[in-house]
């Protein structure tokens, strides 16, 4: 099992990741521009090995529980710098882990709408130390706006990905999509997780988050 101990954006926050694209929802707009594909081969190999381990969820869950028990100093943990919740049992495994390790704040982003629904992973059912943020994309190239379906959009905080080359145009589109009131409550990520922390405990009442395309 491979746990990453931070990076230039996240600071010292550890994370568990899976391979890009193959664990993500089919047709996601970020696939062609996925920055993870530029990672060093050794890092990507580690993600592949994590995915192989994730085919045996009981073993993975035991290894993760052992790791968290041995790293008591960890207070924030990101699930998936790369990858997504590829199945209902896999998402439920992470929810069980969060319930077991209440002193750690887990956070993640997802585009796996069907997995979330089938897991009944609505915010009121999630442990307080498990933050799930849904991702949305503004138009990029020939891709249209890509938003979570309304039932999920109304329940979760949303992360909007904006292309800095078309920021003004995309902000206009975003306001039309979500309305002025929701846009005014949206906060922008500073680009450094360790200093920012907007995502760690996010709930819908806290507003959405704006990210710049890598």
Place the predicted regions along the sequence by residue.
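Class I S-adenosyl-L-methionine
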Residues: 1-214
